[in-house]
Amino acid sequence: MTGLYELVWRVLHALLCLHLTLTSWLRVRFGTWNWIWRRCCRAASAAVLAPLGFTLRKPRAVGRNRRHHRHPHGGPGPGPGPAATHPRLRWRADVRSLQKLPVHMGLLVTEEVQEPSFSDIASLVVWCMAVGISYISVYDHQGIFKRNNSRLMDEILKQQQELLGQDCSKYSAEFANSNDKDDQDLNCPSAVKVLSPEDGKADIVRAAQDFCQLVAQQQRKPTDLDVDLLGSLLSSHGFPDPDLVLKFGPVDSTLGFLPWQIRLTEIVSLPSHLNISYEDFFSALRQYAACEQRLGK
């Protein structure tokens, strides 16, 4: 039985090297250039159109006819139309403009900081909930979020109240911590899981054990192990594979984030999660909605 375990582990290691290393590097590299290109285009458009804005600007309304609109962050900001008066209306309109929406989004922090921003990650989680993303994974390679998962949950609850207001009471969701079987309720229809480097390795070990059990029970042969079978064994142990990962930081690596499950994942790179804006978040969703996933074909 020991020899079978060793054989399975060697096969898994070879498959991981072949399927992940090159694809992960290329997607991270191209994702960074795409983000820089969008930023440059946005700045150029603003420089060209700014004079027209000053020339064609209408005079502001005064007195009791003047209105103030809300930004998705909860702060004041100008904007026409009823959708701007309530963040949730804007989020609904934004979602309708997308051709597709990820079912599972990963938030991957690779920055070398003393402590990541719990409030900024909580805002990202709440935005995911608001637009209808069903599964959200939060990961940092130092395991800070996982060690402080209760603090992160408190921050998410706080951000929900600030960004969603009374709408929070209409929903319920699951805060799934792999170290705590007593899941805690949140007030939005999504499941949130906090991960660390150990989780991806543990999933592969459990999948290998399941396969060895099937072989021992003569339900499978050792030669039956392939990409599809391993994927099905892994998916039976938790969330579906991520459709989209937002990677924050300059590191051209996913640093152990679910190494097998992201072989077909779209990765969008952003410089930092600090002071992340809703516009950057929605820009990543637009990029995902516009991409054509060939699934290896």
Curated annotation (Swiss-Prot):
Ranges of Basic residues composition bias in the record: 63-73
Catalytic activity: n isopentenyl diphosphate + (2E,6E)-farnesyl diphosphate = a di-trans,poly-cis-polyprenyl diphosphate + n diphosphate
EC annotation from Swiss-Prot or TrEMBL: 2.5.1.87
Subcellular location: Endoplasmic reticulum membrane
Family: Belongs to the UPP synthase family.
Function summary: With DHDDS, forms the dehydrodolichyl diphosphate synthase (DDS) complex, an essential component of the dolichol monophosphate (Dol-P) biosynthetic machinery. Both subunits contribute to enzymatic activity, i.e. condensation of multiple copies of isopentenyl pyrophosphate (IPP) to farnesyl pyrophosphate (FPP) to produce dehydrodolichyl diphosphate (Dedol-PP), a precursor of dolichol phosphate which is utilized as a sugar carrier in protein glycosylation in the endoplasmic reticulum (ER). Synthesizes long-chain polyprenols, mostly of C95 and C100 chain length.
The keyword Nucleotide-binding belongs to this UniProt entry's keyword annotation: no
Pfam family, one: Prenyltransf
Stated name of the protein: Dehydrodolichyl diphosphate synthase complex subunit Nus1
InterPro entries: Nus1/NgBR, UPP_synth-like, UPP_synth-like_sf
The protein's required cofactors: Mg(2+)
Name of the gene this protein is made from: Nus1
EC class: transferase
One GO location term (cellular component): membrane
Motif (RXG motif): 294-296
Keywords assigned: Angiogenesis, Developmental protein, Differentiation, Endoplasmic reticulum, Glycoprotein, Lipid metabolism, Magnesium, Membrane, Receptor, Transferase, Transmembrane, Transmembrane helix
